[in-house]
């Protein structure tokens, strides 16, 4: 399959998890537009995977200066092929405090990330928020969209998760969507991506993969304030997911 077909299959697989996926991206980019007054923004797609946010940024802001940072060899290969000549691709580990040294520039108008940082330990996320702040220009924004249940609605949040799982399994059963595991099995069977999948397993051994960690949005807002952002709050919410924003 070509890189563009892999992009499309990634989108379908992810949309099965998050039917309102595009809404969070639209909210992010609307915030970017608001703080750049119509000029082309400088954006960092953090833990950007195959380039989901980067592609949407370039579609909305054709003159944008985009950098994508990730560590996954498979997703970086897809991103590199589909974003060639349109974005700077950076291979870096967000678990390493020196990750910013690999960036081609700083002073970003926006650092955007989605459904990625929940794989990091809590203490690392809190520290990372401060490091991200240093990559922003004064007045720039950081937006993190992820699984962030509303802690004051535990019963409804649980039911929303359960119902989402039921609908997702129905999509898998009907063949309308590919599951996470099936998508990666297809990667491993692809002649071009299989070597990258082997490399990926060395970086993220299945047996030692850190468990997902999904605190409520308020935890993230508090962490942003502690990290020195002048303003922090919830930008968007959809069910048990939310996007928090911090303003430098």
Residue spans for each PLM region:
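Conserved class I S-adenosyl-L-methionine
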Residues: 1-38, 52-56, 143-172, 176-179
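Class I SAM-dependent methyltransferase SAM/SAH-binding core
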Residues: 44, 51-99
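A conserved beta-strand element that flanks and buttresses the S-adenosyl-L-methionine
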Residues: 112
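Short catalytic micro-motifs in class I SAM-dependent methyltransferases
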Residues: 115-119
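A short glycine-rich, Lys/Arg-flanked "PGG" loop and its adjoining helix->strand segment in the class I
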Residues: 126-138
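Short alpha-helix
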Residues: 212-227
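Core SAM-dependent methyltransferase catalytic element
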Residues: 227-248
């Amino acid at each position: 399959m070509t890189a563009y077909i892999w992009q499309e299959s990634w989108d379908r697989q992810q949309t099965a998890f998050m039917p309102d996926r595009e809404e969070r991206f639209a909210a992010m980019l609307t915030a970017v537009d608001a703080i750049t007054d119509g000029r082309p923004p400088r954006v960092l797609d953090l833990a950007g995977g195959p380039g989901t946010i980067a592609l949407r940024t370039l579609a909305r802001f054709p003159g944008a200066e985009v950098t994508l940072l990730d560590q996954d060899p498979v997703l970086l290969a897809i991103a590199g092929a589909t974003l060639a000549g349109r974005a700077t691709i950076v291979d870096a580990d967000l678990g390493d405090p020196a990750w910013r040294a690999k960036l081609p520039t700083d002073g970003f108008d926006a650092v955007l990330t989605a459904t990625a940082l929940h794989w990091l330990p809590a203490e690392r996320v809190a520290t990372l928020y401060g490091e991200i702040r240093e990559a922003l220009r004064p007045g720039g924004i950081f937006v993190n969209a992820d699984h962030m249940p509303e802690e004051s609605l535990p019963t409804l949040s649980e039911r929303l998760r359960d119902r989402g799982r039921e609908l997702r399994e129905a999509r898998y059963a009907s063949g309308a969507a590919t599951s996470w595991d099936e998508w990666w099995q297809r990667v491993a069977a692809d002649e071009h991506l299989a070597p990258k999948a082997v490399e990926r397993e060395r970086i993220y051994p299945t047996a030692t993969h850190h468990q997902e960690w999904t605190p409520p949005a308020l935890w993230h807002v508090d962490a942003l304030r502690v990290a020195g952002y002048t303003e922090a709050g919830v930008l968007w919410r959809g069910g048990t997911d939310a996007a928090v924003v911090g303003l430098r």
